[in-house]
């Protein structure tokens, strides 16, 4: 049968459930769709056609239109990392707007299980080794509502943990950026993280939350000075 239904006897949690689904999958691609989201009838066909056009790509993702050219557009690992870490960002999206080549997902080891930031971690792991395809927007609909996992992460400040993942990726031997680009990317991330922490502590008056994040991301009080430096 083309469609099979598998039920978990217990709630496995977000990422363990996705890993189990990937283990059951037999197809060339993985397409996750959370129960509160929607993919339009043409969406899957567009995603698959784009991935077939670029067989060396591990990840396809819906992105806003770009003046640089039409989609689908394929990016090298270096170009993808440069756009995310030195440009306006690239990997800040969830699985609803993504399609993954199954072989690459398995070679990368699947999701680590880090709550809230596991998607981002997987995207940069894939992008370090394989090409990435930009897809047009409008293929899916992502619903926001109270009680969903995304809102839980926002309210618990869990998404700040993406800083540690980004810093590890920039320091990894597999990072496709040059040494000069890595240095600039690290400076940018540190400055933004420092500004986020100060905003949380001062403007939002969440001192304890800011301190917990600083400890978890090994960001020392003196490191906050980087928030006042000019952009690299």
Show the residue positions of the predicted features:
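Acidic donor-binding segment of Leloir-type glycosyltransferases
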Residues: 1-7
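Glycine-rich, basic loop-to-helix element that forms the pyrophosphate-binding segment
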Residues: 7-25
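Short glycine/serine/threonine-enriched helix-capping/active-site loop
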Residues: 8, 57-64, 135, 142
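Short aromatic/hydrophobic "clamp" motif used to bind/position activated sugar donors
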Residues: 30
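The conserved acidic donor/metal-binding loop of glycosyltransferases
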Residues: 34-38
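Conserved donor NDP-sugar-binding/catalytic core segment of glycosyltransferases
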Residues: 42-73
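Conserved nucleotide-sugar donor-binding catalytic segment
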Residues: 77-163
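C-terminal subregions of glycosyltransferases and related glycan-biosynthesis enzymes
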Residues: 121, 144-232
